[in-house]
């Protein structure tokens, strides 16, 4: 796996799924391929994106700044600086300085990532802030190691929280989660279906599922009534894909 592929993988792992994630993935690909060279416009676009947390925006802004060639005197953006200040905690700043000194001695991406993984997310963000604000310089490869270590920590905590939700025994939360998943699967089916004739059936199934979820939410139903809803949808989706000769495993 190339360095930029690895960076893209880690950064996208902390972006919530949805149309915005696809948009960000495209922007990252363009930036890494040297197709997008207008850093100012890119940062303005990033600043106004909804849903993303300030820290995620800060990390993306840092990656764009590292990658897109820009004029020397280009102004640093406040929304990135605020996100990478370690919540203003002086302890984070102290640790960030110690980490920065260690990173100065590293020359490889993996070496930097290993060193960074032993620090807290706040210290890692502060260290990115130091580099972003030009208070310190490291090689691009080392900076990317720092980015990926930060993303790994964030993704780990998101995964723990997601696992807690999936394994919860609370029937109401499980019921709502099944309905949300059915709804998002239906949306994905509609997007994939396109305008071909064979797509009509998939669209119909997706539409029925969405109406069913709406009705269940409106009238209120027993928590077990949603069991199997998403699985039925996925079965329909896979049958449709086979007929279309498409094999997409990513909805499993």
Swiss-Prot record:
Additional note from the record: Most abundant protein in virion. When expressed alone can form virus-like particles in transfected cells.
Keyword Membrane: yes
SUPFAM superfamilies (UniProt xref): Influenza virus matrix protein M1 (SSF48145)
Region: RNP-binding, residue numbers: 165-252
Keywords: Host nucleus, Membrane, RNA-binding, Viral matrix protein, Virion
Annotated compartments: Virion membrane; Host nucleus
Gene: M
Family annotation (InterPro entries): Flu_matrix_M1, Flu_matrix_M1_C, Flu_matrix_M1_N, Flu_matrix_M1_N_sub1, Flu_matrix_M1_N_sub2, INFV_M1
Name of this chain's protein: Matrix protein 1
């Amino acid at each position: 796996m190339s360095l930029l592929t690895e960076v893209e993988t880690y950064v996208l792992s902390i972006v919530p799924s949805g149309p915005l994630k696809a948009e960000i993935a495209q922007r990252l690909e363009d930036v890494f391929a040297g197709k997008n060279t207008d850093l100012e416009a890119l940062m303005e676009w990033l600043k106004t994106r909804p849903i993303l947390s300030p820290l995620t925006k800060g990390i993306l802004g840092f990656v764009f700044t590292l990658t897109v060639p820009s004029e020397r005197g280009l102004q640093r953006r406040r929304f990135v600086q605020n996100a990478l200040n370690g919540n203003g905690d002086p302890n984070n700043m102290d640790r960030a300085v110690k980490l920065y000194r260690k990173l100065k001695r590293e020359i490889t991406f993996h070496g930097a990532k290993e060193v960074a993984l032993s620090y807290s997310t706040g210290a890692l963000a502060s260290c990115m802030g130091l580099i972003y604000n030009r208070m310190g310089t490291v090689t691009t490869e080392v900076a990317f190691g720092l980015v990926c270590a930060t993303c790994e920590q964030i993704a780990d905590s998101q995964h723990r929280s997601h696992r807690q939700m999936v394994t919860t025994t609370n029937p109401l939360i499980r019921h709502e989660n099944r309905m949300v998943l059915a709804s998002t699967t239906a949306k994905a089916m509609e997007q994939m279906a396109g305008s071909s004739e064979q797509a009509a059936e998939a669209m119909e199934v997706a539409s029925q599922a969405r109406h069913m979820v709406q009705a269940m939410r409106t009238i209120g139903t027993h928590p077990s009534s949603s069991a199997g809803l998403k699985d039925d949808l996925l079965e329909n989706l896979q049958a449709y894909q086979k007929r279309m000769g498409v094999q997409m495993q990513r909805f499993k």
